[in-house]
Structures are given as structure tokens and as C-alpha cells.
Amino acid sequence: PNAVDWQDSRPPDIPWPHTVVYESHVKGFTQLNPAIPPELRGTFEGMGHKASVEYIKSLGITSVELLPVHWFPDDQHLLDRGLKNFWGYNSLGFFAPASRYYGPAGIQGFRDMVRAYHDAGIEVILDVVYNHTAEGNELGPTLSFKGIDNFCYYRTMPDQHRYYINDTGTGNTVNTSHPRVLQMVMDSLRYWAESMQIDGFRFDLGTILGREPEGFDPRGGFFDAVTQDPVLSKLKLIGEPWDIGPGGYQVGGFPPGWGEWNDKYRDTVREYWKGDNVSNDFAARLLGSGDLYDQRGRRPWASVNFITAHDGFTPVSN
């Protein structure tokens, strides 16, 4: 990892209480920007172009969070309809940037993008999807892990191993309680942190990563491994604290050191915006959601406050 020349670029290391996150999509953010050269639009190089960086900087953003950039295929049901997977929440290559976002510089364009944001004092956070893969359910394609060791990499029904536990709503669930699978996830995170100088991660359906055979455990294998890792434990770690599995809603339940998407903040602010009588709840959310984060050594910054994101409606559509 240290063989890459980062030209003395250093991570900004923004304190959590001062962090302002901007969720963005590499292609969606750049593909129509006339200030970016046509050959760079829709690419990592376009995302790292001066026009992109200066705009984000002008907003007062401290951390840009990129929607999934791990390699992902287009689902067959989309291809059959002449469509493509735009968001990218169906990863398969956990160690490879999505080549569809490559510009003329290839993978170096990703590193150049990260360096451009670091030089501007802005962190780069990746939205990562380790909870499921693009291989789908028992009717889905065998692209990688199914063929390597199906029962190791995926959680299957105890009495019918042909069928997958579907706590993700996508057809399969990655078995992060298996030591080799956990090792793969940790190796992937270290690769992005060290070789690509990423400053943090937002974990899609993060509850799944903490679900052990007996249920969700904030002291479980995944959380324990991250806490003990000398590199990852120093990064910004943000969980989406829910899934559709048993006990899946875990807002306020992640371990110390983690931030969480706070949907109670989102919903309360939108209700207040509409004129609903939620003044007390609104005040509690603005003051740090102490009912959720004033325990177990957690801090107000653990609440990642947002009103809208890539999921759901725009604010005016509430």
C-alpha cells in the first residue's frame, strides 16, 4: 500500500463534531456538468475535477460520501428491460473500484480523486455494501462466492440449505459471523483505507454485520474486529442501523465510536416541517437525541442527522 505516491497528501482528519457529510454519486454528480471535460464526466476523474471539488468546498462540506463504488454488475432483469443498475447497491468485487467509473487514467483516477479532496481539506467516505452480493437467491447467478463456498459465504436456511436467509431483501445475506468471511471484509476495508486513503465508511444495512447466530450484538465479531484494528478504529464509521431481519431496528444500539444514520431525526424534522405538533420531539433531536446516545459511552455526534438521502422521498414529498 505504501508504494503508491500520494505526493505528501494527508487525510484531513476532521473531528466528528465538525463533520458535515455530502452524499454523492460519481456519475450522477458529474455527467451533466459543463465545467467538466466531456471525457471525464461520469468518472472518478470528473468527481475529482476542480469544478466538483470547488463546488463541494463552497457548500461548507467536510466529508463527501460516495454511493457504492465497489465493482458491481448489472442485474439480468434490468438488462432484459434495457436498463442498468445506477445506484450500485449490489456489489460483488469488494477489492475493485467499479470500472464503469474509470476515465482515461483508470484506477489511478480514483487515487487522484481522493488526493484532490484531501488537498482541499475534504474527507472521502465510501458507502459500502458487505451485507449481500449480486448473486441473489437460489435462482440467482453463480458469479463468485456461491461457487467458492456457498455455505461459508452466505447464511442459509437451517433445514433447507438450498435457500438463503434474506435479512437484506435482496435474496441473500453475507455470513459475516464466519471467520473467513469476516477476514475478507476486514481485508477489504484495510485495502480501501491504506491503498486508497479512504477516511471512513458508511455501512449499508449495518445491523446485519452485527448479527450473530443469537441475534444482534454490539460486541459481536465484526464490531470487535473493527474496534481492535489499529487502522480502521481511527476512521469514521457510520452504520445504517436497520435491516428487515429479526430485531433489525437498532438505532441507538451500535457500539461507542460509531455514528449512525438517525431516522428519528429525519422523521421528526419532516413532521415539524409539515406543521405537526412535535415541538418537544423536535427539540430533543436538535439537542443530540440524548434518549438514543446518552449511554454506553456514546456522544451526541453519534447521531448522523439527515432529512433526506438516496432512499425515499425528497423533503417536499413527505
What are these regions (language model features)?
Residues 1-23, 30-39:
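The feature marks proteins involved in alpha-glucan
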Residues 17-27, 58-63, 91, 171, ...:
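Extracellular structured ligand-interaction cores
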